């Protein structure tokens, strides 16, 4: 591995992303595919690029990402979290800006479990008065 490579792990819902950052030309590879190829939705691509655009390093760093589990939205969020952590390892002075934007905090929201006697997590069976 290259000596000037920075790593960050990101998680969101049931997705986990491993992000490797190194100086380059702004190339982003997700699971051996380009960002545009991997994420069809423009929203997901925007979410992934947010931390880089905030610190204005979009054209200066190459990203290699592997992501597993969950769906498209969760994976995009996990990659964003991983990029944020890798950027902080790359340059600690970026932390306040990333923190202010809310990218450092892990979004702890996940699916609530189904309870016994209910149809879903909170949906009760229909009540019949008589």
UniProtKB/Swiss-Prot annotation:
Belongs to the universal ribosomal protein uS9 family. Keywords: Ribonucleoprotein, Ribosomal protein. This is Small ribosomal subunit protein uS9. InterPro entries: Ribosomal_Su5_D2-typ_SF, Ribosomal_uS9, Ribosomal_uS9_bac/plastid, Ribosomal_uS9_CS, Ribsml_uS5_D2-typ_fold_subgr. Pfam families: Ribosomal_S9. GO terms for molecular function: RNA binding; structural constituent of ribosome. NCBIfam families: PRK00132.1. It comes from Vibrio parahaemolyticus serotype O3:K6 (strain RIMD 2210633). One of its GO terms (biological process) is translation. PROSITE patterns: RIBOSOMAL_S9 (PS00360). The lineage of its organism: Bacteria, Pseudomonadati, Pseudomonadota, Gammaproteobacteria, Vibrionales. Disulfide bonds: none annotated. HAMAP family: Ribosomal_uS9_B. SUPFAM superfamilies: Ribosomal protein S5 domain 2-like. One of its GO terms (cellular component) is cytosolic small ribosomal subunit.
